[in-house]
Amino acid sequence: LKPIDFSKFYQLQSAFGNFGGSMYLDGKPFPYSYLELSKPTGKYVDRTILKAINLLSTKGFIHYAGNACSPGLQFPEISNSGHIAIEDANNCGVQIINVLGSPLLSNAVTISAEPFMNLQIRESWKSFDDYISNMSSKYRVRTNKALTTTENYSVQALSIQQANEWIPQCAQMLGHTLKDKTLAISPNISAMLHTFVRTLKDDFKVWGYYKNAMLCGFISAIDSNDGTYAMHLGLTDQAAEDSLYQRMMYDVIRHGIENQSQFVCLGRTATEIKSTMGALPLENSYLFFTKGKILTWVIKGYKKFFHRTKSYQIRNPFKD
């Protein structure tokens, strides 16, 4: 997994509405944002608490390196010294950094995150058929079944020039899909999607899935010089029952192969499902920095008593 061009990354980060500026990690600048959390259902976390966190963040109390709306595109480099020098012009209360691996630093609390699932594209895969042919019969049958089951869904590229027409519906489907899965939902999903379209232009790909002339799902991806990153996915409940999720993932893999990408990052969540497609987990974690003793105690308490790492079993769909 290789990061996208830093200048392009910074341009995207600075275009988000919650962009804050730059923090310095061991003297190197890295963009940060004011953390935005949302939980429309209120199923797991009291929305009042989330509003309080968001208020603290907008007041400059919590700084998040990068943006939770664009995970996995860049990771700050962490030295092996066991300590990182972090400078923040506003000297906020808490800084949160998503990094590869699980480094132990003397001035940070490390909390594990769900792995990013990354598929390395083999040189022998000149087409999507080559990719399927590399699978063992068991997984080849599963893949073909997922593709056959969704044959009644047609797919077409959504034009960025006509983004105003499809973004509202896609934003609604994305919010519906994520509402029980993550806290990191932008309060304004439409504006977030517009930011990707406006900033990345032709490097931002969006495909819509239609059944009976109705848009039932979409998936987006970012093309970089080295690879493809699956980004946003939204679909209706019926489309989910029809295994359209798997079809979308396979279509992004198809795009990556045809685009001669070195890898396709399928993002977080659904770890076992993505492993059946050949993706491998990429360990990453969050580093929490704070100078406040009470805040340090709270973060360590959360890690010890509340944080749970999901268990999963990695599958190998390939013959070799």
Please annotate each region the language model reported.
Residues 30-40, 103-130, 134, 195, ...:
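Active-site/acyl-donor-binding loops of N-acyltransferases
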Residues 16-20, 26, 65, 81, ...:
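Feature targets compositionally biased, intrinsically disordered low-complexity regions
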Residues 38-111, 227-286:
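Acyl-donor binding region in acyl/amide transferases
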Residues 55-56, 120-122, 142-145, 179-183, ...:
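Glycine-rich loops and low-complexity Gly/Arg-rich segments
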Residues 1-43, 95-241:
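A conserved beta-strand-loop-helix scaffold within acyl/acetyltransferase catalytic domains
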Residues 59-64, 148-151, 186-189, 237-238, ...:
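Short C-terminal domain-edge/linker segments immediately following a structured domain
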Residues 9-13, 89, 150, 245, ...:
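Generic hydrophobic, helix-prone segments enriched in Leu/Val/Ile
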